[in-house]
Amino acid sequence: MVQAPSVYVCGFVERPDAPPKDACLHLDPLTVKSQLPLKKPLPLTVEHLPDAPVGSVFGLYQSRAGLFSAASITSGVFLSLLDSIYHDCDIAQSQRLPLPREPKLEALHAWLPSLSLASLHPDIPQTTADGGKLSFFDHVSICALGRRRGTTAVYGTDLAWVLKHFSDLEPSIAAQIENDANAAKRESGCPEDHPLPLTKLIAKAIDAGFLRNRVETLRQDRGVANIPAESYLKASDAPDLQKPDKALQSPPPASTDPDTMLSGNAGEGATACGGSAAAGQDLISVPRNTFMTLLQTNLDNKPPRQTPLPYAAPLPPFSHQAIATAPSYGPGAGAVAPAGGYFTSPGGYYAGPAGGDPGAFLAMDAHTYHPHPHPPPAYFGLPGLFGPPPPVPPYYGSHLRADYVPAPSRSNKRKRDPEEDEEGGGLFPGEDATLYRKDIAGLSKSVNELQHTLQALRRETLSYGHTGVGYCPQQGPCYTHPGPYGFQPHQSYEVPRYVPHPPPPPTSHQAAQAQPPPPGTQAPEAHCVAESTIPEAGAAGNSGPREDTNPQQPTTEGHHRGKKLVQASASGVAQSKEPTTPKAKSVSAHLKSIFCEELLNKRVA
């Protein structure tokens, strides 16, 4: 067991069971085997910064699980910086496992949890012009996120404790690493402390904050490396930043809340922001437009709320004794009763058993006013004869007593916000706007409407061809009248709708071609290709020569050394050095080209 004041860092720098997506990151097993063991230690840097060396890599080892790296951090300036970072970093101080407090180790696991190997690009020959050979391995860096999967770093002051976390590592290789570490400790003298470029380190930390799904990717790397949970790794922990002495205080503002700082990453947002509410459940991120569409669809599919029908009182019994003569119509038949009373019909009304004689019919003068507020009931079958008729329920539908049922309430439907990708306000630096989120259904509908309109105009134009106005032969030139009714150069059809006088006789070279159609046949449609030609390249807005977006790979020796290396750090400078693929054509230019092709196909047909 090796004890040293320095910090050891070990981990896989390449895993064959998780091949990278970029072809330049693949390592040839034969080439790797020819370069091992290392003839001299490799530099250990931070984020591939050449002016930020913090230690040395004393060995690279080929195991069954992949290429394994073992290094030590000996820079006193860097170790002192880690102590200062720990006291001001809440994520570094968060700990849920019963492990001893190690400020340096916890700060390293929170800041630089991955390893990145810088090797020679596979397209660059290892043999130089003077017959020398270039070193295939250049350096190893500790970084925020590696481009190869399974490259999780484990830090510790005890080398045996560090190697114990890699269950895929053979015991023989672990013993060889301990022997090489003892030999490197004896051979190395007093380490030199170089001043660190703090500005560059801060810039790299800012870049790492905008890596998409960084925490989720770190979880994946930890699973690929098969590292147990008994470590200082922060990738799978949702830190509890609630301190006991601040439990009764108000929550901090949003600008300094650590949960808010972690909400920029999709994976951390699911754990840190979800917190105890998620209770360990797996959460997924859904785009805002998709969520609003699902919510609105759920509201629209709800059945409408049925209102109960009002209770209708039973109608009074019909009696033939109440039948009387039809009311007479006179000048006062349309009088309006004042408020509080009613008018009786001209023939009287039925008094009922309360009046003495069950069949008594009280005769009243026409339109006699009665002060009591409730008129006598009108019997079924004779409305209006024995008092005012009952109010007729409003008719909605096919049933007389059908009530109005309101449509499903849409009060909770809110207006959609404008797309942030279209305005460019919701994009992080370095991200591209997803143009294909635009609604193409409206544009397709407009294209269909234009096609139907063009077909209608074509049919209408063909109908004018039988009226004797004339037509142009299929291969002949088009007739253009110079007057106000003449054919305009930007119209889509050749035959004018109205010609005030017959066209002039064709010239000698046209007379041989202009032949009238046979009887009973329809005149063919003329083609004016020169007047309505729509160049397909012009629709896309690219009139000049295109620039070459694929620069050639540097193969000469005169180029800079940095252009020959493949750096496997996600936030390093390697991404800016590699050639970028041309961006996809915009949606608007694509739709314009489709529309022009449709117009040309319709005209040829």
Swiss-Prot record:
**Protein name as catalogued:** Capsid scaffolding protein
Pfam families, per database record = Peptidase_S21
Q: Which GO terms describe its molecular function?
A: identical protein binding; serine-type endopeptidase activity
Provide one Gene Ontology biological process annotation. Answer: proteolysis
- Which portions of the sequence form the region Interaction with pAP? 281-300
- Family, as annotated: Belongs to the herpesviridae capsid scaffolding protein family.
What keywords does the record list, in alphabetical order? Host cytoplasm, Host nucleus, Hydrolase, Phosphoprotein, Protease, Serine protease, Viral capsid assembly, Viral release from host cell
The record's active-site residues are: 48 (charge relay system), 116 (charge relay system), 139 (charge relay system)
Motif Nuclear localization signal, chain ranges: 410-416
**EC number in record:** 3.4.21.97
Q: Where is the composition biased (Polar residues)?
A: 568-579
Lineage per the UniProt record: Viruses, Duplodnaviria, Heunggongvirae, Peploviricota, Herviviricetes
UniProt site positions, description: Cleavage: 235-236, 568-569
* This protein's domain notes: Region of interaction between pPR and pAP is called Amino conserved domain (ACD). The region of interaction with major capsid protein is called carboxyl conserved domain (CCD).
